Structure formats: C-alpha cells, structure tokens
C-alpha cells in the first residue's frame, strides 16, 4: 500500500505520497504497529521515500521505533521522528536519538499547553525552550537532522480562530532563533536544506 501510494497515487486523485507515513505508534508499542514500521522500511527501499514516525508517549518510545526500523533495514538518515518536543524530554535521550542518524522533528511550535495526565507530560516546552533545545543539538553538530513545523491540525490553530496560524515560525520563531544565537546559515539548513533533502527521493 505504501509503495502504491508513492508510485500510483491515492485512488484516482492523481496525488502521490511524498513520504511514507506519518506512521502512528503508541505505548506500549504494539506488534501491529511494529509490523507497519517494518512495512515502511521495506517500502522505503523500493521507493526511496523518507519515513515519518509518530512515537508513543513514553521517553523511550522514539528509540524503540528507530530500533525496529533499523532492524528492518531502513535508511535511518531518511527517517523522521515526529513530536520530539513532547516525546523525548531528556537531553541525553535526544542526543542518543540523534546519534542514530535519524531526523528529530520539533513540530509543536506555537503550542504551549499541557497534555492530559494520561500522557504523563504535564509541561510542554514553549517556543523559547524548543529553540534552546535545537541550539543544543546544532552545537553538537546535528543541524542536518532537525525539522521544525507547527502541528496545525485543529481549527484553533488557525489565525481566524485565535491561533498562531501557518506563518508563526517565519514571523515569530525565526527572529527568536537569531536572538538566541542561531546563524542565518543554520536557520537555512534547518528550514530549507533539510526538508529539500528529505523530500527528494533517494
């Protein structure tokens, strides 16, 4: 199905997938979810497309997803882990995840609320903290493994309903990145070069 979505498109729409996923995983990481991650790895080999994985809500969930993808033969430099800003809170774990070669996606820009207690994440970092964490990663040489976005999936995310809208990163976050010491070259790497490389089929 993944291969068909890339090569033939979705139904009769003429629209083709540009990546594999987002593959949704939960915690505990179920066998069926692991099977889908393995299928994504196989589809990556055939299509050359990148894989995007949504990890479950556990500090080690992202690493477990990467282990399954790696064992299935995925090219980890073309695997993106979503929601790092809520899923991997310990700095050492972020570094270990980056060392695998995968891309860490900070995709909750503009969201500063809390997740329900059942997710066991009460404090969600604000944009300033997100940028601090990104700088920590770039300082260690992982600038080519960072994605950023805003996970605008509800009406409340849109400007007309009181949200930040789709311009938030360019309008608000980039100036803060510069204040916090990220060079224009680093910003261009994160915002232009990384997506361009990931969305180019290997």
Where are these regions (language model features)?
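Active-site gating/metal-coordination segments in enzymes
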Residues: 1-46, 103, 110, 120
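Acidic (Asp/Glu)-rich catalytic clusters
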Residues: 5-15, 42-45, 70-74, 94-101, ...
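Structural preference for beta-strand elements that scaffold enzyme active sites
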Residues: 17-19, 50-52, 78-80, 101-105, ...
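Active-site beta-loop-alpha junctions enriched in small/polar residues
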Residues: 25, 56-58, 82-87, 109-111, ...
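Distinct, well-ordered alpha-helical segments
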Residues: 31-34, 58-73, 90-98
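Active-site glycine- and acidic-residue-rich loops that bind
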Residues: 81-91, 111-135
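Short acidic/histidine-rich active-site segments
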Residues: 106-107, 142-163, 187
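Mid-to-C-terminal alpha-helical segments outside catalytic/metal-binding sites
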Residues: 168-202
